Amino acid sequence: LHSFPTRRSSDLIQGVVQKQYPDSYLGEDEMADVRKHMIFHGRVQGVGFRYTAKYLARSMNLTGWVKNEYDGTVVMEVQGREAMIFELMKGLNRNQFIQIDWIDTEEKETETESSFEVKY
């Protein structure tokens, strides 16, 4: 289980992406699909988080789902290339209404699916 805080300025996510995926990184692992189970904490409900995630994920050919929880968090499972998942995180962090304070992340087994959906 990995947890990392984020800042509104997106500096932290930018730093994580740059450390894990420097410009010279072009290994085979970049092309392998991974699946991540993520729990987002912060101002993540009532701000278009799920629909932004769906739009971005579909535009990046990622699969999975996103769902609001009763405790005010948003849970998402997303599958695809790890670099694209981090691009999704950067896109979510750029939204002016979404305030991600913390993300709990766990890697899961990949699944066979063909789209990204909002669960209710």
Where do the model's predicted regions map?
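Short, small-residue-biased leader/transition segments that mark boundaries at the very start
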Residues: 2-9
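Intrinsically disordered, low-complexity, mixed-charge
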Residues: 12-120
